[in-house]
Structure formats: structure tokens, C-alpha cells
Amino acid sequence: MPSMSERRKATDERIYRAAIEEFGRRGYVNTTLSNIAKSAGITPGLIVQNFGSKEELYRKISLDITDRIYQLFSDLTDDWHNRCVTIVRRLKEQLELHENAIVYLDFYVSLITSLDTPDDVLNELYEMYNRSPVKLLIRGGQEAGDVIEGDPYSLHSLFWTTLYNTIQMCYNNKLDYPPDEWFVDVLRKH
């Protein structure tokens, strides 16, 4: 029989996975604790007991996923073009390796594109964004004259939105060619 701490950990993992799916599918505002609880097969009170509130759960997931994604790219040292290609390939590999990776990507895109993300979460994400390998990649590419001019934050959002759509097409087998080089052209100065 599992110990109390093992049962709690298993319950927390079920809540966490269910919350990622619900937030990714419905967005922050349209997701309720009841939605998450139903998906996890538990009561809403257990979510509050283990995570505090919907906002705290969303905040934890947001920061965890953002940190995981940034860690995938923390070791990139090539020029901006090769880094872009590597980012696309690594994300695609993660999707192929992990059955639920697309759910995490759905959540992340919902997080960065939603107008309803709580302010404190946005503030923490903005702090993380300042250390983002993609932002640094864009800024370095602009300084070298290789990347189009514009606000790095807006280009960062364009990067992730385009990448998400490209990977979705690959994931759903609707893209007949490797996206790596095509994707880099989105940011390239012509």
C-alpha cells in the first residue's frame, strides 16, 4: 500500500496534468477548478488544499513549463541561424519523444497569447522573458543585422506563434517538408 506522501504526490501529478490540459484547451478564464477536478477524478477542494487556488496552480504550471522550455535552449552557442534551426529541431524531438508534449505546448501558447493571464503571472513571465534564449537570439541577430528590426518581445511572440503552428502541422502530418529552414526565414532580414 502506497504511503501517504506517495498518494499525495500521485494526486498532485494527476491534478497538474489535468490542469495543463484544461488551461491549454480552455484558457485561464474559462477553466474552472471543477473542470480540472473532473478531469483529474477528484474534488475541487483537493485542488485548493494541495495548490491553494486556480491562480496559484496556473502560476506554478506557467513558470514550470516556461523554465523547461528555456532549459532546452540554454546551451545554444551557434550563430542565430543555427540556433533557430536547433530550437525547431529540439521542440520537434520533444514532441516525438513525449506523448503529452503537445499538451504542454498548447498550454504555453495559451499562456503567452491570452489576454486573461493574471498580472502577477505575467510579471514573473516577463522577468523570465528577459533571460529568454529566444529573446537573446533575436536581439543578437538584430545587432548582427541578420534579423528584422522590431521590438524583440513582439518578435519573440511571433517566433513562438509561428513555431507552434509549424510544429502542429508536423505533429498532425500536414506538412510534407522539414520546417527548420523555412521557419528561420520568418525572422531573417531580406
Model-derived features: where do they sit?
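N-terminal intrinsically disordered/low-complexity leader segments
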Residues: 1-10
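C-terminal peripheral helix-coil segments that are non-catalytic and often amphipathic
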Residues: 2, 85-93, 131-143, 160-190
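Helix-turn-helix
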Residues: 10, 14, 18, 22-56, ...
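Hydrophobic alpha-helical connector segments
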Residues: 60, 74-101, 154-159
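Short, basic, alpha-helical segments at the C-terminal edge of helix-turn-helix-like DNA-binding modules
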Residues: 63-69
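Amphipathic alpha-helical packing segments from all-alpha helical-bundle domains
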Residues: 70, 117-144, 153, 157
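Amphipathic alpha-helical segments used for helix-helix packing
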Residues: 96-117
